[in-house]
Amino acid sequence: MSKLKKPILESNCVADKLCDSLNMEDNNNDKPDTINVDLGSPITPLQTQPSGLSSSTSSFSSSSSGSVTGHAGHTPPVTRKPDSVQPVPSASKSKSSNLSSAAKSSKSSTTPSSAAQFGGSYSPARAQSRASSQVGAKTGNIIRPSSNSASVTTKPSGNKSSVSSKQSLKILPAGNLVPSGKVQITGMTQEKPRSMVLGPGAKSYGYGSIIRGNNLSPVKPTMMSDSSSVLPLTLSNNSTGGPDAYTSWKIAIYGSNPEEVKRFGNEMFRKGCFAEALKLYDRAIELSPSNATYHSNRAAALSSLGQIGEAVNECEIAIKLDPNFARAHHRLASLLLRLGYVDNAGIHLYSVEEPLDPTVVKMLQQVDKHLNKCTYARRRGEWSIVLTEVSAAIASGADSSPQLAMCKAEALLKLLRLDDAQRVLECVPKVEPFPASFSHTRFFDMIAEAYTSFVKSQMELALGRFENAVVTAEKASKIDPQNNEVEILYKNVRLITRARDRGNDLYELERYTEARSAYAEGLKYDPSNATLLCYRADCFFKVGMWESSIEDCNHALLILPSYTKPRLQRAALYTKLERWAEAVSDYEILRKELPYDKEIAESLFHAQVALKKSRGEVVLNMEFGGEVEEISSLEELKAALTRPGVSVVHFFRASDPQCKEISTFVDALCVRYPSLHFLKVEIVKCPEVGNAERVRVVPTFKIYKLGIRMKEIVCPSKEALEKTVRHYGL
């Protein structure tokens, strides 16, 4: 029994020490383990251990924000709640309370702080028993305070204090450094530094609108919704973003000061974040719609995003709000210059007395010079000069002009480079919405929008889309009814379409001569129409005028090289005239454009056979449309390789996945290249063939010509295999 009483007495003794450490009377000031703590200092001294305790002794971690206030001679009941790992200041009121508490503690240098008093030593046995009975207590090498709060109530009882816990007390071993909440202990906490951010301005923080960043989100106005896709913005140097950056962005986008919102927008614009800058400028305009600067800045953001038309409209609004706003005039001049409106750009550039940007002035002069040369060359029909000058004007700065792109397409069309004209037409800049104030600006003596429809109508006509050509020509005529060029085009398009319709009707009635005359009537108005030339070539073919048909096909292909119909017609004509080399050349081009057309493949095969015969080559046992032939013996393989022509032998294993995949492609090659012999050998079924050919890896391809091996490929890709087959098969 005596052995059991000793630790109990020791435990009670330590408990008394613990209770004494919680006593707030003045007579406790002389305790050797009590240290005064300056709450304004980020440093808390470590506690010394009594010699009677082991190294596992633990200590409490407490707040220093004035949760327990000491008074000489009397200690009132105080309820204390420990802070979480990351304290969150909810309002300026709590901040002032913290500051006042810190001030009180610093005034009395002899009064021990609660944080120091809670750091008194105690018995490990009692600590472990108490910790095991409480929920949320943690032990270990690294300790983190529990999220649950605990309350400690201290009541005066002579020289002792009683401790009651409503929730779990944090029993922490000595020697482990634990964040104490609001008392920042150097080296013990690794919190991220909080940056200075701009406050929303709704309250007074004592230092203007600059506050410490925190995890609190500002109050959201009901008029706007949160957008998590927006790039966060922060005033700090912390590039990692985080809650402070997000808070700064929210403060900016939901702020009530338009100048601050504009300033944030300018910062985003300088960083190249034009979409985010645009949203901030929109917010500034919402707060102050009559500010010309905000509209001008919004125009700059829109211009950087490629929305030229809307940027022009914003500049016009800014100028209406402030007619003497030089920046808006210069910005509008630059935008109009990009659209090719040189005269209007010059008006705005020289409308203010501000110093002009020499770069913009030089750009304006260059574009104006090239456009003047382009206009004169177009009137004379010198389309090569037109193409050169309009390209130079675009390169000089008018890079967003739909009309200049249309002029380039028109020049290529007149130079019979229809394929190039199509590519240019696909890349015409789109200006939406089109500035209404410049809708009647003229290009080449034509209203800008009418000129766009004018060129489109010519392109539709050249591509054989006659109905679309009529519609676009009619649209141009309605926009600019006084223009002579537009009226002539509209008239010619209707006549050409009528001639095409009449020729098609006669062709269906097999009245080929009359149909040919109808097509010729349409060619009077458009001599370079590839569609009408092809139709007339077909009529020549039907009546046996093969040479005339070839001439029309040549002319059509010169204008539009990608036109399939005249090439197919010409290949058939070459076959009729037994011009096998030209026929094979045309059919090979058609095979590339239409690889799965069996009629073209068969025509190519027969043309190749005829070409070989014309050269004196032996062409025995050559059949079109054969399948891949399976070889079952070595003698069968030798017999197959003695055939004239090229043979492709595929060595494979049926169970191999790669062989299965490539076998499907070999079947397709057999259809694409019917003049070649395709053979396959399963090396598991025919091991003697594989051994004789020394096949060790599958799939393996060997190409033979007249029994002589030309090439061997092991595990090729589909592209490499087809390239090799095409090389040796043609």
UniProtKB/Swiss-Prot annotation:
**Keywords, ordered alphabetically:** Repeat, TPR repeat
What spans are recorded as compositionally biased (Polar residues)? 144-154
**Residue ranges with Low complexity bias:** 45-67, 90-116, 125-134, 155-168
GO biological process terms, alphabetically, are: response to stress
Please give the name of this protein.
TPR repeat-containing thioredoxin TTL2
| Endpoints of the signal sequence | none
TPR repeat ranges?
258-291, 293-325, 327-359, 448-483, 496-529, 531-563, 565-600
Q: What happens when the gene is disrupted?
A: Decreased efficiency of the male gametophyte transmission and reduced fertility.
Q: Which residues form a coiled coil?
A: none
PROSITE patterns found in the cross-reference section: TPR, TPR_REGION
Pfam families per the UniProt record, alphabetical:
Thioredoxin (PF00085), TPR_11 (PF13414), TPR_16 (PF13432)
What SUPFAM superfamilies does the entry give?
Thioredoxin-like (SSF52833), TPR-like (SSF48452)
* Induction details: Not induced by salt treatment.
Organism the protein comes from: Arabidopsis thaliana
Annotated function? Plays a role in the transmission of male gametophyte.
Q: Which domain of life is it from?
A: Eukaryota
Chain ranges of the Thioredoxin domain: 636-722
> Which tissues show it?
Specifically expressed in pollen grains.
Keyword Repeat, does the record have it? yes
